[in-house]
Amino acid sequence: MFMKTDDFDYKLPEELIASYPLENRDASRLLKLNKQTGEIADYKFTDFIDFINPGDLLVFNNSKVMLARLYGSKTTGAKLEYLIERIKNPKLFETHIKANRSPAIGSEIYVEDTLAKVLDKDGGMYLLEIQGDKDIYQLMEEFGHIPLPPYMKRDDEEFDAERYQTVYAQDLGSVAALTAGLHFSKELMQQIKDKGVDIAYITLHVGSGTFKPVQVDDVESHKMHAEVISVPVEVCQKIRQTKENGGRVITIGTTSVRSLETAGQNGQIEPYQGETDIFLYPGKKFNVVDAMITNFHLPKSTLIMLVSAFADKEKIIKAYEHAIAERYRFFSYGDAMFIF
């Protein structure tokens, strides 16, 4: 079935892009979409507690956003900007580099105040090895900036270090926020536990490819970027138990969806550690996930394709049109949907 990327386009008024977070995490709005009937209803995010039951399992991604934007220069003084993509070891890392002229393999360049050597280049990705005493973790800690997405059109500010991070973030490695999780305050997490709803954590480190628009006309010929995930054995046990007892597996965010569906590709959820480049678009089957919380996604993105696979493209486009008419806030710092 030929599916055009343009079929996942929609017109969004620019003023609905949320460049700043609300004062309180859980003060956002929640659009509830029944994927069977297409019924849409408007709620506050704190109402989510009423949509879940004891016996349900919520699966969160506990990846932590790195202070991945760094600056530096060539030995000539020419300015460089880095977006750290993946850390191999404390002195060795993959990074994007923004420069007037690309640094050559074998050359030495500065990452902030520390010298590094360009070991390799693959497409737009460089492999750097730090020559000085500091490691990449120290450099990020001392100089790093939160890598806000380009559509926010602003530099990061002090509050972003906290607000572009979930309250349960633990495992450092993402270059973008786990946006569905940003709505969960510590109070709401406590209410969920008090209600007898079970919680589990997987890890998927979001790469910068998450911002990459689909550039081919035919959806199926798009090549997904690979990201590192971990779905531990105890999470698989909880999922099997939940299903056996008639509860629902509810994922918080598309990263949790992609992780669980990778681990459940053979129809049975199994522990998984490694890379995934799973691409979920209409026609693909979901073996694990019963419901999800997710933000509103960019036009023509792989993420709007994922939610369209879960709930049917026409229903998603209708829900987005409703959200625009009702002045919902879009993207990373925006409002959320509950699709069930």
Curated annotation (Swiss-Prot):
Compartments reported by the entry: Cytoplasm
Organism this protein belongs to: Francisella tularensis subsp. holarctica (strain OSU18)
NCBIfam families, per database record: PRK00147.1 (NF001140), queA (TIGR00113)
GO biological process: queuosine biosynthetic process; tRNA wobble guanine modification
Origin organism lineage: Bacteria, Pseudomonadati, Pseudomonadota, Gammaproteobacteria, Thiotrichales
Transmembrane segments: none
EC number: 2.4.99.17
Gene Ontology MF terms in the entry: S-adenosylmethionine:tRNA ribosyltransferase-isomerase activity
Catalytic activity: 7-aminomethyl-7-carbaguanosine(34) in tRNA + S-adenosyl-L-methionine = epoxyqueuosine(34) in tRNA + adenine + L-methionine + 2 H(+)
Broad EC category: transferase
UniProt key word Cytoplasm: yes
Function: Transfers and isomerizes the ribose moiety from AdoMet to the 7-aminomethyl group of 7-deazaguanine (preQ1-tRNA) to give epoxyqueuosine (oQ-tRNA).
Cellular component per GO, a single term: cytoplasm
Protein name listed in UniProt: S-adenosylmethionine:tRNA ribosyltransferase-isomerase
Pathway(s) the chain acts in: tRNA modification; tRNA-queuosine biosynthesis
One Pfam family here: Queuosine_synth
Keyword field: Cytoplasm, Queuosine biosynthesis, S-adenosyl-L-methionine, Transferase
Subunit structure: Monomer.
Family: Belongs to the QueA family.
InterPro entries: QueA, QueA_dom1, QueA_dom2, QueA_sf
Keyword Chloroplast in record: no
